[in-house]
Regions:
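Catalytic-core segments of hydrolase enzymes
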Residues: 219, 249, 253, 258-348, ...
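Protease zymogen maturation seam
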Residues: 73-131, 139-147, 160-161, 165-202, ...
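Inhibitory N-terminal propeptides of secreted protease zymogens
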Residues: 21-95, 120-123, 261-263
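Catalytic-core environment of secreted peptidases
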Residues: 163-164, 168, 186-201, 210, ...
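Active-site glycine-centered loops adjacent to acidic/histidine catalytic or metal-binding residues
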Residues: 136, 296, 357
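Bacterial N-terminal signal peptides
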Residues: 9-17
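Flexible, small-residue-rich helix->loop connector segments that border functional cores
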Residues: 135-145, 178, 185-193, 203-231, ...
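Hydrolase catalytic cores
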Residues: 222-223, 233-239, 254, 262-263, ...
Length: 416
């Protein structure tokens, strides 16, 4: 850079930037192919924190956010502050024990799986040779229900590959069991397999109240139940406090594509219409990766991202009567619904849990996508929508606000 150009750039920086805050600001930037991030960082007085491989997308700590003219002069194509993303909350009714003689995937016979005819689809496809990335919190690799269902993933929190280490049982999450009455309608199913609800004295070591530690295991358990021959790639982006950010999630989406995922489940959301998320989703779609996301648990039609982004299979929650779950989001951006009330799934430490939330509806759709993707490489979303059951009549207050309806796995995989 000549002395004259440097002077002009410095003048622009002084003229168009806001006053420097006390603390640096995390800024995501995508630069043009001809720009150099080292030079960009130097001109902004910034520190380079991280880079997304093969994307020209970088995370900087900047003293000030450059104005649009300044950014343009440096070759920055777009930029946004790296905002935080919090793990969605969910209702947890109970933690269950199941006798060791019971098969690890006993919960695939639960009422919600019967409603969507998941078992009826397995003679036609089991998800063989399909990798499903699950962008989530930590997963219990040693859980009986997940053994043989997990492939190598990556832990973006600790920045190292994720492998076969089981969770420390002394740190697994536990919520109050006072509402076990909600399980009454499922007692018959539980009794078939000898499942029992832990009381507080039995579960005394399960003291962590943060759901982030169990969320990844619960979602993986749902995927494994629906597509048992698929391989789940756990990508941890949420720490044990349930915190992540836009940059880390965008990095994980691209990692999934570059490491062979054909389906990606995203059971989280943010109100931020993020350019980085949109860029990552478009990258995945261009690679023919099926992207599934939970619609959110705020009982609103306000869009949640990435679910509301074009091409993402946004999934709401319904109950066993095909009524919209009281907590579930709805709206014009929805693709389908799936059961999300009182779902049985794997829980860290070899236990099982009963949970509610759109977080557990999305993995049902992701598992269904894996079954279809095992049979054919195109038309996955069309197969899911065409096979879905219209539930407008059961939800008169949400007509055309619940997408194509509630999924029917058997019909999506092998139409009558």
């Amino acid at each position: 850079m000549t002395r004259r150009n440097f002077s002009l750039t410095l003048i622009l920086l002084l003229a168009f930037s806001v006053s420097a805050p006390a603390n640096p600001l995390p800024l995501i930037v995508q630069i043009s192919p001809t720009a150099n991030i080292t030079n960009v960082a130097a001109m902004l007085g910034a520190t380079l924190v991280d880079t997304i491989p093969r994307a020209n997308i970088h995370l900087l700590n900047v003293p000030v956010v450059p104005s649009s003219p300044m950014a343009y002069s440096l070759g920055i194509e777009w930029m946004e502050l790296n905002t935080g993303v919090t793990m969605p909350g969910f209702v947890q009714v109970g933690i269950l024990t199941v006798p060791g003689t019971t098969v690890s995937d006993w919960y695939k016979y639960q009422p919600s799986m019967q409603l969507i005819r998941a078992g009826a689809a397995l003679p036609y496809s089991t998800g063989q040779a399909v990798v499903v990335a699950d962008i989530n919190s930590q997963v219990d690799y040693g859980h009986p229900a997940l053994r043989g269902h997990l492939t190598s993933g990556y832990d973006f929190v600790t920045a190292r590959p994720a492998g076969s280490t089981a969770l420390n049982q002394a740190e697994t999450g536990f919520l109050d069991q006072a509402e076990t009455g909600f399980l009454d309608s499922e007692r018959g199913f539980m009794n078939q397999f000898g499942a029992g609800v832990l009381d507080r004295s039995q579960a005394g070591f399960l003291y962590s109240l943060n759901p982030a530690y169990s969320h990844g295991t619960l979602c993986a358990g749902v995927i494994a139940a629906i597509a048992p021959a698929s391989m789940i790639m756990p990508l941890r982006v949420f720490d044990d406090a349930g915190r992540s950010d836009i940059f880390t999630i965008a990095k994980a989406i691209r990692y999934a594509v570059q490491h062979g995922a054909q389906v990606t489940n995203m059971s989280f959301g943010t109100l931020t219409a993020s350019p980085a998320l949109r860029n990552a989703i478009n990258y995945a779609r261009n690679a023919d990766v099926v992207m599934v996301a939970s619609a959110g648990n705020n009982n609103t039609s306000n869009p949640q991202y990435p679910a509301a982004l074009s091409g993402v299979l946004a999934t709401a929650a319904t109950d066993l009567l095909d009524w919209k779950a009281s907590f579930s989001n709805y709206g014009s951006s929805l693709f389908v619904t799936a059961p999300g009330v009182k779902i049985f799934s794997a829980y860290p430490g070899g236990y099982y849990s009963v949970v509610s939330g759109t977080s557990f509806s999305a993995p049902m759709v992701a598992g269904t996508a894996a079954l279809i993707r095992s049979l054919r490489t195109t038309g996955v979303s069309t197969s899911i929508s065409a096979g879905s059951v219209n539930i407008n009549s059961r939800n008169p207050g949400y007509v055309n606000q619940l997408g194509y309806g509630r999924i029917d796995v058997r019909q999506a995989v092998h139409p009558n």
